[in-house]
Amino acid sequence: VPDYQNPIISPKPLEQPGVLTATLDSSQLERILKEISEVVAVADATLDRESLEVRVTGPALEIRRAAYALAAKSTDSLFAPTKILASPVQLFLPGATDTWPRNTIVVTGENSLQVLVLRQDGPRDDYKLYQYSDLLPNISFPEVPAEVVGANALKEDNKFLSMDPASLVEGLGNLLNRGFESPWALLIDPDNQYVADV
């Protein structure tokens, strides 16, 4: 009779409940970023909206397709799609989870920086670019867990959040429309130069 409590004799290793590890390491990330940036660069060269789907999804796919539509109607380089920066990696925050979808946040670039959100929908799916944005100059990053540890995603009902994420979208819209007359203005630092610029 097998001894299922002994990992040496047991036919499969014992599970360690509650221990979550990072879903990606830096060598995997480097390969994924290289593959994504190559697919996007080829699609950018021909404004091929369909080939993007291989490694781009969600809001990033919508943004890229809209950029291609603008670029197709203009010869001005101002409307050229933003290049996806695969390196150097400035910040790498993989998820720590055993479920899907899995998300990883990466900040890349040198003189100009981008934040990229990568998502894997299932265990047999490739990571795809889910969201991206250029960052403002002189931005500083908060301290994050080490890449070997990863980070857990917060649930919407987390008690440590000052508001639920669903309300945040409504509040941001109200704030943009009404400015400092919005009841949401109390949550904004009035001395923040970025807020004044927007």
Give residue ranges: language-model regions.
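Short, low-complexity N-terminal intrinsically disordered segments enriched in polar/charged residues
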Residues: 2-42, 54, 94, 98, ...
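Short solvent-exposed beta->alpha transition segments
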Residues: 49-89, 188-198
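Surface-exposed, charged secondary-structure patches
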Residues: 71-115
